[in-house]
Structures are given as C-alpha cells and as structure tokens.
C-alpha cells in the first residue's frame, strides 16, 4: 500500500487590520452588526436573533448591545483598533449598538447615517389599524 504524504497542519494566519468599518442595520424587528475592513470584506458579524433573543426581544436596545459586543470581540482578533460606523435603519438598537462598540474598546472615528430615503419611489405599506 502506497504511503500518502502527510501534510502538516498549518495554522491559518489572520490578516491584521488597524482600521475597520462597522455597519449597523437596525430594523424594527432585528439588528445586524457587520465589522469589515476598509475594502468592505467582512471580518465579523452578529445579530440580535443570533445572540439568543427571539421574537419581540430581538428588537430591543439590549439585544442590539449584546450583538454589537459579540461582533466587536470577534473582530479584535484581527487587530482592529479604530472604527468608522455606518448606521442604517430606524430601529431601536441604533444608539445602544454604537455605545456597545465604544465600551468594547474601539476608538470610533466617524458616525454616518446611511438610511435610504426614497425620492418618492415605492408606495409604502398601509398604516396598521390595531
């Protein structure tokens, strides 16, 4: 039987990124935080639903805070120190996600609101009658 040359397991070297971007998508139902490098390649991400919150608790500011802390600690393995924050959406987790990223230890250099605003595009959904 022929011997198969064994490959020694090589440890994957993570690229070191000093500056990153945090994209916070805060909808009424969930909050998604993605931390990327300057080119937009995702380093880490977390959601309120993936952090253990289900149903109406996903849309709370505390759930957004927990998700931002999880995404922030995962991105620290890449050496990210400074973050530029882009916030999209009207959800309740906007402010608390930014505060959580600050408390993890990131220096926030810029906060930009990139919420899409229609120039009278699609017709909005009808108003709720409760």
Curated annotation (Swiss-Prot):
SUPFAM superfamilies: Translational machinery components. GO terms for molecular function: rRNA binding; structural constituent of ribosome. InterPro entries: Ribosomal_uS11, Ribosomal_uS11_bac-type, Ribosomal_uS11_CS, Ribosomal_uS11_sf. The keyword Cytoplasm does not apply. GO terms for biological process: translation. GO terms for cellular component: ribonucleoprotein complex; ribosome. The keyword rRNA-binding applies. Keywords: Ribonucleoprotein, Ribosomal protein, RNA-binding, rRNA-binding. Located on the platform of the 30S subunit, it bridges several disparate RNA helices of the 16S rRNA. Forms part of the Shine-Dalgarno cleft in the 70S ribosome. Part of the 30S ribosomal subunit. Interacts with proteins S7 and S18. Binds to IF-3. Belongs to the universal ribosomal protein uS11 family. PANTHER family: 40S RIBOSOMAL PROTEIN S14/30S RIBOSOMAL PROTEIN S11. This is Small ribosomal subunit protein uS11. The gene is rpsK.
